[in-house]
């Protein structure tokens, strides 16, 4: 049930029934002395570690179960399928965003962090440290999978993001841009203070559309790139798997998501929220 709005106030002075949080300072060195920052970094590290562990293990398990050389002619009918893999990625994002949103904001993705930084939701210091924690967590999560399933991990490609045969580099890049745009646009919409003010259930349900966006994007782009839309996910697998193809395609999974995130931030803040003046300048508040 939506929150009641004071219509008379709106009609009289055109006042808004919600308050936009003040823009984060571009550089906030004072954050380095606050425990809340380090608590958030730990949350991002652990969440990304768990995300990569569960999802990459799901991919490896699916490939093993559908390997005809191991499981016979009926192997193609086994495993969770592409639908199950997409659910693993989307479901884990839903769970982890729900668990960490109150601590770190539940980014779990450098592209999401970049989009929120461009929208002045986080400072440059916090954004860079978040990205470092996410990448380190991803590497550790994939390393756990390899540690538990060493032979299977190497045999089945390590869950690496690579451009599929038959697709051009431009197609792969476009798929990553569009997929990340969908994700980051959903993040902005689900956490919009205007929506939160008018619908009391939105903050609780915000992780659901974000996870569902990840699920839908995976269905569309798994055949093209294996679905990156998360540079930490792609980097973590590339580091542990250490395959030439994974490294040569790595730039696609950084450039594409960062472009998609930037476009989503500009679209939401400059066009959709222009009347709210939600897009602050890049001048420091100091």
UniProtKB/Swiss-Prot annotation:
Q: Which chain regions cross the lipid bilayer?
A: 40-60, 77-97, 128-148, 170-190, 204-224, 252-272
Protein role? Water channel required to facilitate the transport of water across cell membrane. May play a role in root water uptake.
Q: Where is this motif: NPA 1?
A: 109-111
* Family annotation (Pfam families): MIP
Protein's organism: Oryza sativa subsp. japonica
SUPFAM superfamilies cross-referenced by the UniProt entry: Aquaporin-like
- Protein's membrane topology: Multi-pass membrane protein
Q: Which PANTHER family match?
A: AQUAPORIN OR AQUAGLYCEROPORIN RELATED (PTHR45687)
Recorded hits in CDD domains, A to Z, give: MIP (cd00333)
Q: What is this protein called?
A: Aquaporin PIP2-4
Q: Which UniProt keywords apply?
A: Cell membrane, Membrane, Repeat, Transmembrane, Transmembrane helix, Transport
Q: Where in the cell is it found?
A: Cell membrane
Domain comment text?
Aquaporins contain two tandem repeats each containing three membrane-spanning domains and a pore-forming loop with the signature motif Asn-Pro-Ala (NPA).
Induction note: Circadian-regulation. Expression is higher during the light phase than during the dark phase. Down-regulated by chilling.
Question: Its family?
Answer: Belongs to the MIP/aquaporin (TC 1.A.8) family. PIP (TC 1.A.8.11) subfamily.
| Record lineage | Eukaryota, Viridiplantae, Streptophyta, Embryophyta, Tracheophyta
Disulfide bond entries: none
């Amino acid at each position: 049930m939506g929150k009641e709005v004071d219509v008379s106030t709106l009609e009289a002075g055109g006042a808004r029934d919600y308050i936009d949080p003040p823009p984060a300072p571009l550089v906030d060195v004072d954050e380095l002395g606050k425990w809340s920052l380090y608590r958030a970094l730990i949350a991002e590290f652990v969440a990304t570690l768990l995300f990569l562990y569960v999802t990459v293990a799901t991919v490896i398990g699916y490939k093993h179960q559908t390997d005809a050389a191991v499981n016979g002619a009926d192997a193609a009918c086994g495993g969770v399928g592409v639908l199950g893999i997409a659910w693993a990625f989307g479901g884990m994002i839903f769970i982890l965003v729900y668990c960490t949103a109150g601590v770190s904001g539940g980014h779990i993705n450098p592209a999401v962090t970049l989009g929120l930084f461009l929208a002045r939701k986080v400072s440059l210091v916090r954004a860079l440290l978040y990205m470092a924690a996410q990448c380190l967590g991803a590497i550790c999560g994939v390393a756990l999978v390899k540690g538990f399933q060493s032979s299977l991990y190497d045999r089945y490609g390590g869950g690496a993001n690579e451009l599929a045969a038959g697709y051009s580099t431009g197609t792969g890049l476009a798929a990553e841009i569009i997929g990340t745009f969908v994700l980051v646009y959903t993040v902005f919409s689900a956490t919009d203070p205007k929506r939160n003010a008018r619908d009391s259930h939105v903050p609780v349900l915000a992780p659901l559309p974000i996870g569902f966006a990840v699920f839908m994007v995976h269905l569309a782009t798994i055949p093209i790139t294996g679905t990156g839309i998360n540079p930490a996910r792609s980097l973590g697998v590339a580091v542990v798997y250490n395959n030439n193809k994974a490294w040569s395609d790595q730039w696609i999974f950084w450039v594409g998501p960062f472009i998609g995130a930037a476009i989503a931030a500009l679209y939401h803040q400059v066009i959709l929220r222009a009347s709210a003046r939600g897009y602050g300048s890049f001048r420091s508040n100091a």
